[in-house]
Amino acid sequence: TRVMPGAKWFSGAKLNYAHHALRHLEDDAEVLVGISQSRARQSLSGADLRAEVSRVRSGLISLGVGHGDRVAGYLPNVCEAVIAFLATASLGAIWTSCAPEFGVGAVLDRFGQVEPKVLFVVDGYRYGRHDVDRSDEIGRLRAGLPTVTSMVVVRHLALARSTESSSPDVIEWSELGNGESDELFIDDVEFDHPLYILYSSGTTGLPKPIVHGHGNITLEHLKVLALHSDMGPSDRFMWFTTTG
């Protein structure tokens, strides 16, 4: 009798989530909007988003990221997080994230298990009227993740740069990929190739990494957005949540 564990779905089929997320976007249409307490409204057109994904993809390649490597984001729910995720996916690398309000121990419990090669971080965030500087937490995260070879800093609060920013393996978001974008290339991967890693709550021990693949998430998002939510190309979607 055949059993489910170990079953393969759509063997031989290849795709990439990033390709399907980007392929129908109109160049001049507003496709990604970021609204934050700490900076002006961000707006990216289809052409802008593809260019930014291409730039960050090139930057990741220059940092040695390739097929199967893990890339982690200690980022809020901002445009840079979406861009970094899509750029990571386009390479066949694997994304994972935690929200910056997580404490250092909670983040290390998660990222430490998946051994990321590159870490995206934010300098801080605003909660109500208060700026929350995460510089100390970033330093402790870096020290606790020996597999990280490069760190990319997103300046969300425009805080003064810490002394660690002078390290050659710490890169500013704006400088990633030399600030330039080329034509966007996307690598096809197997249907079940890992796309991103989420985590269980950790209530019964360490949080357990949960791996989702390109094929199943492409189908799941199509189902939820197009069928369950009846969304089309001109509709807008906001999910009020964090990256955790």
Where are these regions (language model features)?
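Hydrophobic alpha-helical segments in the ANL/AMP-binding
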Residues: 19-23, 61, 79-99, 106-108, ...
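Conserved AMP-binding
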Residues: 75-78, 99-101, 241-244
